[in-house]
């Protein structure tokens, strides 16, 4: 064993290839441990300690020290002062596991020749890994983390016990050319994902987010933010000062502020907005935008988009593509909300029927969740009650209320439900589904292959429904679902034949053997029906 002792000045010391003990004493010393398993103490002063081979124990002592492990393990103590640990494993091809919080790393994870790295009292960490599949978790220090060509995961290890703050400081992360996952929920100063297809999870606290080459996905979680921010992926910036580039797919969760989000050239945008007055412009891909109860302007752009609003006086425009637009408010506020499906076959769903809706080009569907107001609806008028104006709607999904309703639609494949009361349903042309509900209902399918539906929740064990134009040759069906076969005592075509009676008006089918609970098919004879015309589900 060789012992090397410095002076009170600034020394340059080197160990041998054997096991050494090296003391730098005072002064700003530069010490290279050499070969062997060495013990190195920098002493007072701003020292530079380097280990290149063997398993060395390095102590910086007092002062702001720089301690480097080059391709090897070791045990490091920073000592007093602001100390930096550099771990350079760029030439290591095996997997690395590294936890800044626990002060521990493993080189050659799951191999027979693994080595440990232990460290404590370190204020700044600079870590570079090689081509293995690495798992790197930062510490509460200011870290610079660069990974190599493997499929790596970089992120915070956990949270502290008091306030839930992630155990990362002001960091820089560079993951190299692998398909990496960067999970930094506090926000590193700089994130560089490098080549390949990467996933970045962070906040708007980051100064630079660069996905690099490849197909990169960015998730921004800032649900607690209420100050209102702008994120423009097309221009590559956020109003927080964050620069964003190299991102193909983005997901953004924001808080209750009035926020602006512009997709730009993104292939896909997913946005969860709060209750502020938000503006979101989607891109050319399939976007998903959900907003709260503020007065929002949501534009899907090209692609098959989904737009969701919880309420408010909104502008919801799907743009090109087969879009889905959902408005969840119980009313359209002051009537200022405007919904435009744009080109494509769109679905527009509203809870309460009020406002202005333009389906745009294509074959568009209007679905009203709540029962219709009033008792009469005729699609040809372009109005629904006194509060909804619509145009360019080809298909309707509507239900009546508890009164005696009259619902008439046009040429689309409509779904109409009468609910309670003695209702009149007319589907017009198209392949319609008509549900009479309770009461004495009159149903007209119109041209097309129509389905007349009975289910377990439409019976009050009373009422005779009438179908005015049942045409088996035209593809019309009688459909019994749920517990309807049990309720009607008809669960096969043979049962239907046994319950049928030909009258001067047509064919009457008695449900449960009753004269006041059944179905009348106008101008239909029993011979006109076959088992193919009745479906039991």
Regions found by a protein language model. Give the residues of each.
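Low-complexity acidic/polar repeat-biased segments
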Residues: 1-2, 113-128, 134-137, 248-251, ...
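Beta-strand-rich, repetitive solenoid scaffolds
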Residues: 264, 469-470, 480, 509-511, ...
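Generic recognition of long tandem-repeat/solenoid scaffolds
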Residues: 103-112, 116-118, 164, 236-243, ...
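Short strand-coil-strand connectors
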Residues: 110-113, 185, 240, 255, ...
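Intrinsic low-complexity/IDR segments
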Residues: 3, 108, 219-220, 243, ...
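Acidic, glycine-rich calcium-binding repeat modules characteristic of RTX/beta-roll
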Residues: 10-14, 19-97, 101-104, 133-242, ...
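Extended, small-residue-rich solenoid/repeat segments and analogous flexible loops
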Residues: 1-16, 126-128, 251-253, 261-263, ...
């Amino acid at each position: 064993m060789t012992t090397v002792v410095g002076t009170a000045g600034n020394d340059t010391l080197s160990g041998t290839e054997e096991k050494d003990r090296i003391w730098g004493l005072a002064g700003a010393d530069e010490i290279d441990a050499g070969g062997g398993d060495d013990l190195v103490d920098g002493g007072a002063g701003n020292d530079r300690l380097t280990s290149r081979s063997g398993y060395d124990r390095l102590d910086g002592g007092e002062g702001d020290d720089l301690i480097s492990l080059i391709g090897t393990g070791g045990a490091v103590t920073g000592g007093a002062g602001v100390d930096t640990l550099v771990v350079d494993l760029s030439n290591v091809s095996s997997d690395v596991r590294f936890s800044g919080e626990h002060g521990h790393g493993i080189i050659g994870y799951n191999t027979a020749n693994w080595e440990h790295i232990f460290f404590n009292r370190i204020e700044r960490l600079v870590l570079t890994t090689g081509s293995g599949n690495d798992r790197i978790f930062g510490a509460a220090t200011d870290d610079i983390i660069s990974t190599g060509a493997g499929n790596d995961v970089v992120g915070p290890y956990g949270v502290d016990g008091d306030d839930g703050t992630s155990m990362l400081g002001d960091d820089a992360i560079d993951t190299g050319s692998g398909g990496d996952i960067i999970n930094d929920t506090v926000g590193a100063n700089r994130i560089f994902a490098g080549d390949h297809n990467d996933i970045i999870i962070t906040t708007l606290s980051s100064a630079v987010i660069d996905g690099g080459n490849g197909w990169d996905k960015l998730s921004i979680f800032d649900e607690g933010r209420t100050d209102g921010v702008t994120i423009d992926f097309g221009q590559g910036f956020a109003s927080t000062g964050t620069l964003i580039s190299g991102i193909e797919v983005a997901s953004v969760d924001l808080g209750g502020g009035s926020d602006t989000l512009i997709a730009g050239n993104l292939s896909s945008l997913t946005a969860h907005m709060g209750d502020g007055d938000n503006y979101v412009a989607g891109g050319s891909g399939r976007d998903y935008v959900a907003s709260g109860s503020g007065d929002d302007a949501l534009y899907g752009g090209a692609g098959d988009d989904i737009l969701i609003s919880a309420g408010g006086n909104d502008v919801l425009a799907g743009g090109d593509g087969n879009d889905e637009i959902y408005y969840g408010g119980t009313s359209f506020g002051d009537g200022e909300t405007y919904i435009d499906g744009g080109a494509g076959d769109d679905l527009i769903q509203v809870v309460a029927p009020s406002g202005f809706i333009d389906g745009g080009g294509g074959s568009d569907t209007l679905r009203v969740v709540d029962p219709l107001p009033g008792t009469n609806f005729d699609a040809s008028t372009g109005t629904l009650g006194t509060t909804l104006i619509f145009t360019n709607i080809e298909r309707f999904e509507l239900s009546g209320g508890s009164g005696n309703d009259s619902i008439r639609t046009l040429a689309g494949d409509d779904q109409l439900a009468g609910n309670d009361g003695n209702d009149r349903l007319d589907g017009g042309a198209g392949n319609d589904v008509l549900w009479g509900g309770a009461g004495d209902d009159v149903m007209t399918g119109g041209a097309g292959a129509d389905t007349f539906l009975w289910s377990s929740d439409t019976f009050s064990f009373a009422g005779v429904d009438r179908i005015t134009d049942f045409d088996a040759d035209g593809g019309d069906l009688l459909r019994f679902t749920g517990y309807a076969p049990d309720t009607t005592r008809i669960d096969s075509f043979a049962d239907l034949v046994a319950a049928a009676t030909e009258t001067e008006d047509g064919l009457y089918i008695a449900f449960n053997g009753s004269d006041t609970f059944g179905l009348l098919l106008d101008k239909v004879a029993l011979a006109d029906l076959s088992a193919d015309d009745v479906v039991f589900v």
